[in-house]
A protein has these predicted regions:
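Sequence signature of WD/YWTD-type beta-propeller architectures
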Residues: 158-457
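Extracellular glycan-recognition regions
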Residues: 1-161
């Protein structure tokens, strides 16, 4: 945006506003960066929700100032004075403004760090509002510029929605892990989940979910050049869940399907382009998460006698399954590193869901993350140097990974000796279950594919 304007303060606002009309609850997100040094330290940019376009209209905004001040500003009534709640974050460049009825929640961060939030309640702007991006130079004789990136407007799940019965739409996104830049390459009001990147880099494989028995549980190959999705022939296996994985060489596809065994998840393999599934796991439920780099074994989570643990089995089904973990509570998301020397997984054995690792036969189990998040589904980069994960806050049961939450995609270096390393946020996402359940790195290690969620606006 390019703008002048005296200020957004007191009883009279002057600014450039790129808006659209919205109703009900919604979330806005963006990365904001001022262009140039600027003239006035109080130049302002951010996200705004406004009752109308009059200069003295009631509003709420999430604002970043030129001097680094970050705050939630609001005017309660027409012609009233602007009030402010300061954020503890200085110089934020990631901002989010969420409306829940008459509550407005402002979350801010410096890219790489988690959000810090402040909120205000009982601000009555009416159901239909003007919402969007703004800039004011704080000087009517000066023109300033701001760049907004990763702009999202999200319609969250409705209050009281029932998981696995009620669904909202999906967006397939590609994340540049070096810059944090995100690109939406596919949208659908019907939900889909869990992209796998093909080793040749040309396509992604995902599954449909949702409540429609004629549409859910199918696997599709999404061509990145044409942006078209093609149904994969999986024979009788038409109730696939989100635990599907390509072999390292890309020739075979492992699936977790619920068409047999009274709806229990069973692992099958078939050619990557489609074919007749071959059953691999004799026991259920079994949820696939990884092939070994040499293609000889499959890693999966198995529910046996009320316990969910990590197992491996020959990928041709020629031998029995081998249990690799025995700790009480959920162990899930096992994945081989590209060199085959380690298996990373998530476990609740410490009280929170954390990332662990072990040897290829279950030996030397050690904790990798030591933080206050609930971390799920570790994915090693193709060069074995980085570990991606999805991180929930404290608003969930640590043994669960629910749909439709505020989550982070985080990245941490893999250390050879397992010593502690810090994870940084690379994406601020509304998603959760189905976002990155399975390996989704690009073959060159520069990007991660994931699914975010929004209902129709």
């Amino acid at each position: 945006l390019v703008a002048g304007g005296a200020n957004i303060w007191f009883r009279n606002d002057q600014f450039h506003f790129a808006w659209r009309k919205l109703t009900d609850d919604f979330i806005m997100q963006a990365r904001a960066e001022f262009i140039g040094e600027g003239v006035d330290p109080h130049r302002k940019a951010g996200l705004m929700i406004r009752q109308g376009l009059d200069a003295d209209a009631p509003y709420v905004d999430a604002v970043v100032h030129g001097d680094g001040l970050t705050s939630l500003q609001f005017r309660r009534t027409r012609g009233g004075l602007t009030e402010q709640i300061e954020s503890e974050v200085k110089g934020a460049d990631v901002i989010q403004l969420e409306r829940r009825g008459k509550r407005y929640i402002f979350s801010a961060a410096r890219f790489g760090a988690p959000y810090s939030s402040v909120e205000i309640a009982d601000i009555a702007l009416g159901d239909e509002v003007h919402a969007g991006l703004f800039l004011s130079s704080h000087n009517p004789d000066v023109i300033e510029q701001v760049a907004f990136r990763n702009v999202r407007i999200i319609r969250p799940a409705k209050p009281g929605f029932v998981p696995y019965r009620d669904y909202i739409g999906s967006q397939l996104e590609l994340l540049d892990v070096a810059t944090g830049q995100r690109h939406i390459v596919h949208r659908s009001s019907y939900p889909f989940e869990a992209p796998n990147w093909t080793p040749d880099g040309t396509a992604l494989i995902f599954n449909t979910s949702g409540a429609d028995p004629q549409r859910r549980g199918r696997l599709y190959r999404f061509d990145l050049a044409s942006r078209q999705a093609t149904l994969i022939d999986t024979g009788f296996a038409i109730r696939n869940n989100n635990d599907h994985v390509l072999s390292f060489n890309g020739t075979m596809l492992g699936i977790s399907d619920q068409s047999t065994d009274q709806g229990q998840s069973t692992i099958f393999t078939l050619p990557a382009r489609g074919g007749v599934p071959k059953r691999i796991t004799p026991l259920t439920p079994s949820y696939l998460h990884s092939w070994s780099p040499d293609g000889k074994f499959l890693l999966y989570t198995g529910g046996r006698n009320g316990e969910f643990d990590i197992y491996k089995i020959p990928s041709d089904g020629s031998g029995p399954e081998v249990r690799l973990t025995t700790a009480p509570g959920v162990d899930d998301g096992p994945e081989f590193t590209p060199d085959g020397k380690h298996i990373y997984f998530n476990s609740v054995r410490s009280g929170k869901m954390q990332i662990w690792r072990m040897g290829p036969n279950g030996e030397n189990q050690e904790r990798v993350t030591h933080d206050d998040f609930n971390n799920w589904f570790p994915h090693a980069s193709p060069d074995g140097k980085w570990l991606a994960m999805i991180s929930y806050g404290d608003d969930i049961d640590p043994s669960d990974h629910p749909y439709y939450r505020h989550v982070y995609l985080r990245l941490m270096p893999i250390t050879a000796d397992g010593s502690r390393a810090n994870a940084r946020v690379v994406a601020y996402v509304y998603g959760g279950q189905g976002s990155i359940n399975v390996p989704s790195w690009s073959p060159d290690g520069t990007m991660i594919a994931f699914v975010s969620n929004t209902d129709d606006l």
